[in-house]
Amino acid sequence: MLTLEQLADLVGKHRAAAAARVAEFSIGAKKFNFNSHPAIMGVVNLSADSWYRESVCLSADSAVRRAKMLAAQGADIIDLGAESTLANAARVGDAAQTSRLLPVVRALRAAKIPVSVETYSPKVTRAALEAGASVLNLTGTAASRDVYKMVAAHDAAVIICFVQGRNVREVGDFDLSADAVPMMRDFFSRQIETAQRHGVKKILLDPGLGFYYRNLQDSAVRVRHQITVFLNSFRLRELGFPICHALPHAFEFFREEVRCAEPFFAVLAALGKTDLFRTHEVPRIRAVLETLQVIRHS
């Protein structure tokens, strides 16, 4: 059971981190004031393997309609993905990914909706940025130098995901032996240095809680890890950049109420000072964040 005493002890040990401020910048034409107003990233999946059925769109027209609906419901950015991160999902080649992504990216760009593309492929990255994507959601670091050069050339933002492996589809066991934050801080510090050296100015950091490590298949182990990282995320803000989190679903616990899972985890992520919430449930997360803002400013 999570207690007030545990939260007080956590903040007491890391008071400087709790007061840290992060970089604020524009994505597309939209200014993001992360230190005062957390933002929402709505998900549109272009892969039939994605299990969250409400977010799956198998045609460009349906994807554009869903993206515009999410923007109207409160999404600040739309995140597109053409390959599922599920461990048993089929691999999707670069050509197939770009054929699915580009019509949607172009349509949303024309509608002035900031677009993110989730990928670890340099070829998909190049095509997406040239088509008008404003954010690259980088789920692998094997080709990070090339990706950072492309991001900088387009004055785009990059979400650097923590991955223990070449990319999200090639992960093994997660190191659960100790506090994960120092390990993540070291990883992000190296990636930030590399990104900045190649000209990237707009950076967000994602601890990668939605990735399918082999030793996190047990539901209780996975949820305990996710909650611990959510609550400790504010410690990563000392690196100077906003924190992005993909909200989990915890189907084994929520079962037929699975659409309530992301709002539950959003509260914990907000307590850890998350700056960008990646979600399939935009209106529910918007309601949670607006309510927490009222409490914060009361």
Predicted regions and their residues:
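Active-site loop-to-helix "anion-binding N-cap" substructures in soluble metabolic enzymes
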Residues: 25, 70, 77, 119, ...
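Active-site-adjacent loop and "lid" segments of alpha/beta metabolic enzymes
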Residues: 52-61, 65, 69, 85-103, ...
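A generic "binding-loop/recognition-motif" signal
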Residues: 47, 120-121
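Glycine/serine-rich anion-binding loops at beta->alpha junctions
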Residues: 48-57, 73-84, 203, 209
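Structural preference for beta-strand elements that scaffold enzyme active sites
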Residues: 39-43, 76-79, 114-116, 134-135, ...
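Short helix-capping segments at alpha-helix termini
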Residues: 108-113, 197-200, 238-239
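A short, N-terminal amphipathic alpha-helix
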Residues: 65-77, 81, 107-108
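N-terminal amphipathic alpha-helix/helix-capping segment at the start of soluble metabolic enzymes
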Residues: 1-48, 196, 290, 296-298
